[in-house]
Each structure stands twice: as structure tokens, then as C-alpha cells.
Amino acid sequence: RKNRDFIVIVDNMMNLELLTVTSALTADPQYLDMARTHANTTIRNHYRPDYSSWHVVNYNGETGEIISKETEQGHADGSAWSRGQAWGLYGFTMMYRQTRDARYLEQAVHIAEFLMDHPALPKDKIPYWDLDAPVTKDTPRDASSACIMASALIELSTFVQDPVLSQRFLTLAEQQLTSLSKAPYRAKAGENANFILKHSTANKPAGTFDTPLVYADYYYIEALLRYKRLLEGRPVVDVRTVVSDHPDRELWISTLDRIARPVVANLAAGTLKKNLPFESLSADPDRRE
């Protein structure tokens, strides 16, 4: 679309783990450098003074100039779309784990405090689809946001040195998991199209809300597993820098590198569409090449 040259969404923060692990597996620092650059730019351009975030920052793909800041899946451009806040919390917590860069821990803590202290967070701690949306008895919740938040908060609680703050983060995660594990959010076996959780919001402006989502179930299970490991006194996340001692490991890594390198390089250079055309089934002409 015209004047929408390089769209960057806050959701991308959770994907940076792939780049950090790829650097560890290939001993090539360029992937980690890309992850750091992306995270630092997100802090600078996506986040507001209160540590809420825009959903979208639209850049000029040639100059890097910011064209606009928007919240396409939220209530308004200036609102705090709940899942976007959760993605940011998860992503910066992960980036601290992978880099031990204090900037990312600081950012994650600020985001967590923004969410934890937000006056619109309901008593059961399952957020409305947007923290700034008008609240009525029919305002949709987003269980997926709570799942992502809980998983991130469990890990973040292990990084924070202040025991009071650490316990507050863990308590919020426990409250969210307790709410998610019973009605009205937890579905009965065989119901809800066999999804575990009800009442997520994929995209309220597009009319997709009060629905199950596969990533809600995924992060719910991840959060439960992390909580179990925490109670057992084990690290909540295994930080692995090698796949295994399997004899085919080098083949896997070289194949991954061969596939990923041109995609990542062209994406970073803004030449993906030109050099790596693709075919899409989307009805949106902007998604077809």
C-alpha cells in the first residue's frame, strides 16, 4: 500500500528468540546483532512514556523515517491493545534471558508494572481486549493475552532482584493461571472445538472475538509448565545453544543457515519483495506477488 513501506509490529518481539538461537547454533553474530537492533529500535519507537506500546510503526523502507504509529488491532491508535502489551513483555523478558543486557530487563519490568497496576485490569486478571476500550458487560476479554503475560511473568520473576517485586509478578501470574483454569475460560473436554480455552480476541476491529485461539492454548500450557518447573526448583526455561549430539546436527544447522540467511538478509535490507518474490493465496492484493 502507498506510504506503508516497512510495517513493524510489536508482536515481532517474541520472534527474536529465533535469531538469538540461530547465532548460538551457527556461531554467526549477525543474527544476534539483528535481534538487538530490532529490540533497541522497538524500545525507541514503539513505546510511550507510560510503557504502553503502539501496535504498528510504519517506516519509510528507504530512509527509515517514521511515517505513522498505529494500533490496527486495538481500540484506537493511542490505546493499549492488550496482546501487544503481552507480546512486548514476553519478548523483552526473553531478550534479557538470551543476552543478559540490563536494558531489556528494565524494559520488561516497566511493561510488567504498567500492566500489573493498570486500573482497567479486571479482578480475575484476564484483560479486556484493549486496556483503553470502553467497558460494558459485553466488552470482550482476551484470554490469550493473559496466557502470554503469565508465561512471561513467571520467567521475569526469576530475574528480578527485588524480592517484593518478584513476588508481585509471580502472584499476578498465579492469579491469571487460576482464572484461566476454571469457568468461564477453561472449556470442558470435547467442547469448544477441542480447544482448551475460551474467550480470546484475535482481532476485534475485524470482528474476530470471543473465540478460541491456538496460541492461547500454547502459552497457557507453556505457563503451566514453567510454573511447575519453578515449584520444583528448576530453571523455568532451558537455555540451549546446541541442538544435540546427533550425527546429523551439522546438516540441520547448515540447511537452516542456507534457508534463513537470504531471507533475513533481504528482509533487513528491505529487498525481500524484489529479490525473493512469493506466491500468496491472500485476497489482499498487497500480499500477492
Where are these regions (language model features)?
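Glycan-recognition and catalytic cores of secretory/periplasmic carbohydrate-active enzymes
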Residues: 1-289
